[in-house]
């Protein structure tokens, strides 16, 4: 009780219950009460009766996460259903990542320096606090198997082979079109040749980039995330990415693999988990220039819902 804290010499005490006040759709609109969108005013009354004062609702990033984005995993039974639940753009991003040789795996404490390095690069780029490698090692020690660190890497040889196949296929297509035009040119064939020639030039450029990437190593870290597992929800708590490898969509693939492994397929002892918590957003849905817009749009692509906390 609040009186107990006063007896212990507390000057000020803040509490932030992990309780939704109101469920909103992925664009911030409150759901109808018939769909569970009614505000939970009872919790405020209970806390006020205990002697606390509600500090009001705020938007923006604060020291305590006040807005979260989550996805209901109920009824999603396999990877195909999971993929179909995303936006078309996000589905494309995940398929694109796989076609470019990106693979996702869990890492242990012995590789946390790689995780921390990516996290630090992201913190410096996006101007948030970096907690340091020791923090993550202590987190892993405290949470044990419930803390999962995930790394997305580019298999450069696989990427090179994929780009070579695409360039070869386009080269064959262009050669075939040129042969047809040599026999009898039509406007349709010429237009198709121009289009595929442009695609071939782009494919050759990507192949040249893949050849350069091979020189950097066999496996190149592109993104990393940390998750906390529980029986009721899986929480996506920390993440980072290497800006240079943004076109590989590694972060999107990590999210998909996490939902698939930890929620749909489930791990012992939790099994299937019905809630995937993308964690913090700033609660600003209507400003395209907001600093948190990119984070929001990334999470919206997985078709979840937003909600304000106390």
Question: Each PLM stretch: what is its role?
Answer:
Residues 1-61, 175, 222, 229-304:
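Acyl-donor binding region in acyl/amide transferases
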Residues 20-22, 26, 34-40, 50-247, ...:
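A conserved beta-strand-loop-helix scaffold within acyl/acetyltransferase catalytic domains
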Residues 305-309:
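Short, polar N-cap/turn motifs at the start of nucleic acid-interacting alpha helices
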